[in-house]
């Protein structure tokens, strides 16, 4: 969304949830901070899901029995489940803040161009299905590439192939392309973008499909399912947003699961080809099911993360937080 003090016309994109009347569009800083807080909360809370998923995906199924319980038993301390929480929190909070800001601006621009208002349960503009798909796809592509170096650090940290003790050590190790055997290969900044194509092939369709399903469930399905007796209450809005997020994440996660398995294997090995990596996964014991390895963990993590993140984000945007003096430039003028 654009600044209300400099662009009055975009204010029509947002509605007051209690009255249904056009309201003030939140400042971009509000979207950035709200998205960041939402992402940070979900990242720290759900880090064990990410770590276990990475551990499962890094292994060759013919040499190890792949079970979640087996991976947990390998941990010497419970706190190891949160290994990689710092880069994960950094990536998710920064990524979520940038993503929500970019997405809100793109959606506001499209809605303004088409002269559409926001939905009753959301301050976000209501778009057509293909517009939801396109804006989510493009926003994730931009933010995903920007945060790719943090994603690389996060994946290496979560893996037990590399015994990094600090983020600084992992950054040096990735830059110098130091393998698990300690051998230095090719030093390059491009090492931080290894697996970026597979990552974007996973995240962009996921984001586009997610926004498509999220808006569909929220505006066309759950609005009709949630009892009218709580219409207009804050609880109804929260339930609709969280339920829509969980359902959308579940469907989108299943569709894009193969790219997640390929991405993780690329970032933890010397292989650079998506096609070769896919072939290796298919030839291992388990065949095509290897492309869905760790799906249950990603499924649970994405669903819970979406429910937490989007609920916190939308409720912060609609709350008095977005009208506080810090973000209201008209009051400061």
UniProtKB/Swiss-Prot annotation:
Protein name, entry field: Mitochondrial glycine transporter
Reactions the enzyme catalyzes: glycine(in) = glycine(out)
Cellular-component GO terms for this entry: mitochondrial inner membrane
Ranges annotated as spanning the membrane: 32-57, 84-110, 133-158, 195-218, 240-266, 294-312
Function: Mitochondrial glycine transporter that imports glycine into the mitochondrial matrix. Plays an important role in providing glycine for the first enzymatic step in heme biosynthesis, the condensation of glycine with succinyl-CoA to produce 5-aminolevulinate (ALA) in the mitochondrial matrix.
Region (Disordered): 1-25
Family the entry assigns: Belongs to the mitochondrial carrier (TC 2.A.29) family. SLC25A38 subfamily.
Principal subcellular localization: mitochondrion
GO MF entry, a single one: glycine transmembrane transporter activity
Compartments, record wording: Mitochondrion inner membrane
Membrane topology: Multi-pass membrane protein
Keyword annotations: Membrane, Mitochondrion, Mitochondrion inner membrane, Repeat, Transmembrane, Transmembrane helix, Transport
GO BP: any one term: glycine import into mitochondrion
Solcar repeat windows: 26-109, 127-220, 236-319
UniProt source species: Scheffersomyces stipitis (strain ATCC 58785 / CBS 6054 / NBRC 10063 / NRRL Y-11545) (Yeast)
PANTHER family: MITOCHONDRIAL GLYCINE TRANSPORTER
């Amino acid at each position: 969304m654009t600044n209300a003090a400099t662009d009055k016309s975009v204010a029509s994109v947002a509605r007051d949830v209690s009255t249904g009347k056009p309201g003030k569009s939140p400042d971009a800083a509000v979207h950035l901070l709200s998205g960041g807080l939402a992402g940070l909360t979900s990242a720290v809370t759900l880090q064990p899901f990410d770590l276990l998923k990475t551990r499962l995906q890094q292994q060759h199924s013919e040499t190890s029995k792949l079970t979640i319980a087996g991976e947990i038993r390998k941990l010497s301390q419970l706190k190891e489940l949160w290994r990689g929480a710092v880069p994960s929190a950094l990536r998710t909070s920064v990524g979520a803040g940038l993503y929500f800001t970019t997405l809100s601006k793109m959606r506001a621009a499209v809605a303004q161009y088409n002269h559409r208002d926001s939905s009753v349960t959301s301050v976000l503009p209501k778009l057509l299905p293909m517009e939801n798909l396109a804006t989510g796809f493009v926003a994730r592509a931009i933010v995903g590439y920007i945060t790719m170096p943090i994603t690389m650090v996060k994946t290496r940290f979560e893996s037990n192939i590399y015994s990094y003790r600090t983020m600084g050590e992992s950054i040096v190790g990735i830059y110098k392309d130091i393998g698990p055997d300690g051998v230095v290969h090719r030093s390059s900044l491009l090492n931080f973008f290894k697996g970026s194509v597979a990552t974007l092939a996973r995240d962009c369709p996921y984001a586009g499909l997610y926004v498509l399903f999220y808006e569909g469930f929220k505006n066309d399905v759950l609005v009709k399912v949630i009892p009218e007796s709580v219409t207009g209450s804050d609880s109804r809005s929260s339930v609709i947003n969280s339920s829509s997020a969980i359902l959308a994440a579940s469907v989108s996660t299943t569709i894009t699961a193969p790219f997640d398995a390929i991405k993780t294997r690329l970032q933890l090995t010397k292989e650079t080809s998506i096609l070769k990596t896919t072939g290796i996964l298919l030839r291992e014991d388990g065949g095509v099911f290897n492309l869905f390895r760790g799906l249950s963990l990603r499924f649970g993590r994405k669903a819970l993360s979406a429910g937490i993140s989007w609920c916190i984000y939308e409720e912060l945007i609609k709350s008095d937080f977005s009208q506080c003096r810090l973000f209201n430039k008209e009051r400061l003028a």
